[in-house]
Amino acid sequence: SSTETPPSYNQLNYNENLLRFFNSKPVTAPVELDPPKVESSYVSSARGEDARSTLSPVQGFEGSGGSGSSGNFTTGSNLHMSSVTNTSNAGTGTSGTGNSGDGGGGGGANGTGSGAAPPVTLTESLLNKHNDEMEKFMLKKHRESRGRSGEKNKKSANEAMKMLEYSGPGPGHGHGIKRGGSHSWEGEANKPKQQLTLNTIGGGGGGGVGGGMPLFLDITHASSSSQNKGLAGVGVGGAGGVVGGGGSGTGLGGNGNVGSGNGNNNQPSTNQYTQSRLPCTQNINLWPPFSVGITTPTSVLSSHTAVPPSSFSPQHSLFPTFYYIPASIAASSPSSTNTNPNRPHKHAHVHNSSEKPSTSQAAAATMPLQYMTGVMYPHPSLFYTHPAAAAATAMV
């Protein structure tokens, strides 16, 4: 039987029915049709049990044998009918007179057992009634067993769900959950990088034209933060200088002050930057999420120096964008006597020339040209582009 349809009583009790039937040896035919070899004591005891079978059809199958010892073979399947069980099964019918004892088991019927009493049919009504009662009982037990198994399954499922809830999806586990390294843009993992970029990149070795101007710093704080000693070949005007090459420093020495390599911070270039009040902020996120790198305007000389791309220090996620910022001529350092309009080239070295800035360049130097932060301007060509033309193309 399937789990959906409850099994019938006959299916549940099939083996017990077979054992009970063959062990009880019932008589279902009249005595006249019995074979003559049947003993009289067996017939009389069977008739007496037929009379007692009005109480329950089970008692009709009990007490087979004239010796008086009633063999109760159905105790296992009739536990709930113990109150109806005939208690006087021990009969005295050994004389063959048909007196097999009175049926005082609660039914009140006296089994006279005379030879003229017709046998009671056991198969149609009484056995059907008994089967119905037993079927209800067995179905109840079956439902209880199924209910217990269902509760066990539910408990196990609930425990599994609770274990999943308690364990929880940790960092890096599960689908659709942000991994542990992906919060570096907004978490604390990016702060040390910003601090290193904002503080340690100072002037790296003096001697450059306007060397020592710190990269990616607030221009208004240049007087205080440019005193940091820069890293080797990183600072402005250093050995591998980013802006304003040609310095004689090794990248390790010098305070990186604006102007001369070791002079004080009193050069007019700094005053020009501080007075111009460029729209810069101090807290600049150099690694913004999902962006092409946005850089701040760096210090460019009055001769509009264009820096080759290969001279940039490897800053991750920074796009090589160039800015032209007009500035006054800083003639304090030794190398600034000859202004050198450096032109962008494929090689890392910078061509120095002794050309003087033309009148157009001087006019462009005085133009009030400012660039907005966060806006990417077009890349200059390999040939020299005049700042006025570059500004015109940028404004378009």
Curated annotation (Swiss-Prot):
Comp. bias intervals (Low complexity): 333-342
TM region(s), chain numbering: none
Outcome, altering V209G: In strain: O11, ABM and A28
Location relative to the cell: Nucleus; Cytoplasm, Perinuclear region
Post-translational modification remark: Phosphorylated with a circadian rhythmicity, probably by the double-time protein (dbt). Phosphorylation could be implicated in the stability of per monomer and in the formation of heterodimer per-tim.
Region (Disordered): 27-120, 167-188, 253-275, 333-362
Keyword tags: Biological rhythms, Cytoplasm, Nucleus, Phosphoprotein, Repeat
Outcome when changing G207V: In strain: C2
Biased composition, class Gly residues, residue ranges: 93-114, 253-262
Predominant localisation class: nucleus
GO molecular function: transcription cis-regulatory region binding; transcription corepressor binding
GO BP: any one term: negative regulation of transcription by RNA polymerase II
Keyword Nucleus: yes
Entry GO CC: nucleus; perinuclear region of cytoplasm
UniProt entry tagged with the keyword Nucleus: yes
Impact reported for S328P: In strain: A28
Subunit structure: Forms a heterodimer with timeless (TIM); the complex then translocates into the nucleus.
PANTHER family (alphabetical): PERIOD CIRCADIAN PROTEIN (PTHR11269:SF16)
Protein's job: Essential for biological clock functions. Determines the period length of circadian and ultradian rhythms; an increase in PER dosage leads to shortened circadian rhythms and a decrease leads to lengthened circadian rhythms. Essential for the circadian rhythmicity of locomotor activity, eclosion behavior, and for the rhythmic component of the male courtship song that originates in the thoracic nervous system. The biological cycle depends on the rhythmic formation and nuclear localization of the TIM-PER complex. Light induces the degradation of TIM, which promotes elimination of PER.
Protein name: Period circadian protein
